[in-house]
Amino acid sequence: VGEKEVQFITDRYNKFKEIFPYLELWDKEALREKEPLLVYANKERTIDRPEPIVAMGTNDQYTTVDFGEMTKELVKAGQKVDPSKTTDVFFNSEVEEIEKIGSKFKLTTVNGTVYTADFVVVDAGAHSLFLAHKMGYGKHMGSLSMAGSFYITNGTYLNGKVYMVQNDKLPFAALHGDPDILENGKTRFGPTALALLVLERYKGGKSFFQCLKTMNFDGSIMKIFWDLLKDSDIRNYVFKNFLFEVPGINKGLFVKDARKIVPSLSVDDIEYAKGFGGVRPQVLNKTEKKLMLGEASITELEGIIFNMTPSPGATSCLGNAERDIKKVCAHLGKTFYEDQFLADYTDPEIA
């Protein structure tokens, strides 16, 4: 949106088109057909928005995945592949402590159940670093818990996922809108970004003290916070996103930002999506005294991996799983059949 961003997207398209041959560059007229509400300034669709606009996108690739259902299907497939082997999933089994005993790991849950393992992968969101710290690893890191909230429309406003241009200074996903496949295609706008002193949202203050420990607060963490807040872009972003959570004024402020995607959007078109969005760990590197962009893994101890995936998390989760399974197989002396993996999970035309 605007000449500067149009040039940025055009340049990025020219760099990416050879790597992603299915990408297309769409001008205002193409967008009028694909995503008309991006083009029109009024609900009657009689007036165009005044700014130049362009988008980079694709017609024939998926934009949305129900990762909950996908996980269930992957578990089922894993259990069926060799019926002679036991493949169990234990729910409501919160791990309180992990210990290395000889060449094995002992995992103790809050209800006292004990499991042993030859290899452990900890994919516990904001809790991963907490568990690593309890084992004495990852002490050079701290974690800032960032919660993301969403607003949802009362009808279908977009046909596909639409992102605004990312601000390189901000380690959070840019505001975007997409049809929510679990809400009958209603459009979901977000996320906001709010720092919270918990590791898990909607669970009360249960993880408050865990969060304080995981932050690993000292002079290095203080310097990271100070350097972030010195930047006016980041400072304004933090303050504005705090206001997005304040009842009474939040919708009006949020709509002003979301209108960059849908210019005709009004306060009456959206409502705060209660119960949507969780907490992501934003990793703080105490050695380099800066906030880390992207994900972090702790692999200091042979046989265990701690993964911390900030926003955007779903984008990279399967890639991380492929990376980790290779390490697991190497450690256990097993064979990873990459050709079969690629045949099952990639499109040969774009792999």
Which residues make up each language-model segment?
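Dinucleotide-binding Rossmann-like beta1-alpha1 core, especially the glycine-rich loop
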Residues: 1-43, 196-198, 202-208
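Active-site-proximal substrate-binding core of FAD-dependent oxidoreductases
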Residues: 330-351
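General small-molecule cofactor/ligand-binding pocket signal
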Residues: 24-26, 88-90, 271-273
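Helix-loop-beta segment of a Rossmann-like dinucleotide-binding subdomain
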Residues: 35-81, 86, 237-242, 301-309
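A short, glycine/Asx- and small/polar-enriched loop/turn
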Residues: 39-42, 99-106, 284-285
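Flavin-dependent oxidoreductases
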Residues: 98-211
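C-terminal catalytic lobe of FAD-dependent flavoproteins
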Residues: 214-337
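Helical element adjacent to the flavin cofactor pocket in flavoenzyme catalytic cores
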Residues: 55-111, 115-119, 316-329
